[in-house]
Design a protein with these regions (language model features):
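NAD(P)H-binding glycine-rich loop region in Rossmannoid oxidoreductase-like domains
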Residues: 1-44, 55-61
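Oxidoreductase cofactor-interface core, primarily capturing Rossmann-like NAD(P)-dependent enzymes
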Residues: 20, 42-47, 58-117
């Protein structure tokens, strides 16, 4: 399990991502996985947590996904494990999933958020 995977680890690189972009599901994913991972890290004596996040996460409160990322970051900051949060720019290889999440038949709802490659 997770305890065995972290045995002897000094650093955890957390690139976890939710399999769903639905507001409640993505929040549940980041809160549950974050708490579970951080508790296991503390028990294993991990000395640093590196988490991948997204530039502008804190400015996109209309998005359930980004609210969940803010919650994930808050859990990391509140933990006893020293951390780095790396906010990278958008990953445009996910654009199809983002568009499909806003599609309903022949209608696509676009986010009002400004993003660029």
């Amino acid at each position: 399990g997770l305890a065995q995977a972290l045995d002897g680890a000094q650093v955890v690189v957390d690139v976890a991502n939710s399999p769903s972009f639905e507001d409640q599901a993505v929040m549940a994913f980041f809160e549950t996985s974050g708490r579970t991972l951080l508790a296991a890290e503390a028990a294993a004596g991990v000395t640093h947590h590196l988490a991948l996040s997204v530039v502008g996460t804190d400015r996109l409160a209309d998005s359930g996904y980004f609210r969940a990322k803010v919650a994930q970051e808050a859990l990391i900051k509140a933990s006893k494990v020293p951390y780095t949060i790396l906010r990278a720019t958008q990953f445009f290889e996910f654009i199809e999933s983002i568009v499909n999440a806003g599609a309903d038949g022949d209608t696509v709802r676009l986010s009002p958020a400004l993003i660029q490659p």
